[in-house]
Swiss-Prot record:
Catalytic activity, reaction form: thiamine(out) + ATP + H2O = thiamine(in) + ADP + phosphate + H(+)
PANTHER family in alphabetical order: SPERMIDINE/PUTRESCINE IMPORT ATP-BINDING PROTEIN POTA (PTHR42781), THIAMINE IMPORT ATP-BINDING PROTEIN THIQ (PTHR42781:SF1)
Protein name, entry field: Thiamine import ATP-binding protein ThiQ
Gene3D superfamilies: P-loop containing nucleotide triphosphate hydrolases (3.40.50.300)
Length: 232
């Protein structure tokens, strides 16, 4: 279980403060206007930002000050952060060993994830030789191969066309279910959120303004629907 208790980040002395509980294996969408604090929330969970106050626990262990490299969390950004001089296999392998010295079991795990992502025939290629969708599959594979209990997505598929975005969302949801991973996904699209998350959190002005069923947001009946421009 992920639990944030009054986690606070001072943005130009304006406090952004979040309290949130997410159960193990749950898939949650994080929605809200631009600049509301959605990415800040993910970066606090991942450890890329150090909170001014509050606490963060994962499965009962305090990770409030744990460095990002030691947190049981993986994060995928819109900019996939692949290394252009490394092959697909090497980029995925970094998720297992930064020195790329993989044993037989790690090699098999890497190839199994690549097959799951449908990129096992691209392992010798460089990122520059791939399409945008293929690069995001590689970046996702690198996250999944780490087998961390929490996966954070910061709009990684927003630049893809609608059909490809739908394909990637389905792939993420299925993979998280198979690995029993907790998923938190930032999105500007309630429709995308509804595809993989039954529960949504709406962030506004550096606070969690609402949380509940995604379908309630879509219907326009939720108190936070208006924040997203949805009317009943």
């Amino acid at each position: 279980m992920l639990k944030l208790t009054d986690i606070t980040w001072l943005y130009h002395y304006l406090p952004m403060r979040f309290s949130l509980t997410v159960e193990r294996g749950e898939q949650v969408a994080i929605l809200g206007p631009s600049g509301a604090g959605k990415s800040t929330l993910l970066n606090l969970i991942a450890g890329f930002l150090t909170p001014a106050s509050g606490s963060l626990t994962i499965d009962g262990v305090d990770h409030t000050t744990t460095p990002p490299s030691r947190r049981p969390v993986s994060m995928l950004f819109q900019e996939n952060n692949l290394f252009s001089h490394l092959t697909v296999a090497q980029n995925i392998g970094l998720g297992l060993n930064p020195g790329l010295k993989l044993n037989a079991a790690q090699q098999e795990k890497m190839h199994a994830i690549a097959r799951q992502m449908g990129i096992d025939n691209l392992m010798a290629r460089l990122p520059g030789e791939l399409s945008g969708g293929q690069r995001q599959r590689v970046a996702l594979a690198r996250c999944l191969v780490r087998e961390q209990p929490i996966l954070l997505l910061d709009e990684p598929f927003s630049a893809l066309d609608p059909a490809l975005r739908q394909e990637m969302l389905t792939l993420v949801s299925t993979s998280c279910q198979q690995q029993k991973m907790t998923l938190l996904m930032v999105s500007h699209s309630v429709e995308d959120a509804a595809r993989i998350a039954t529960r949504s959190v709406v962030v506004a002005d550096g606070r969690i303004a609402w949380q509940g069923k995604t379908e309630e947001l879509l219907s326009g009946k939720a108190s936070a629907s208006a924040i997203l421009g949805i009317t009943g």
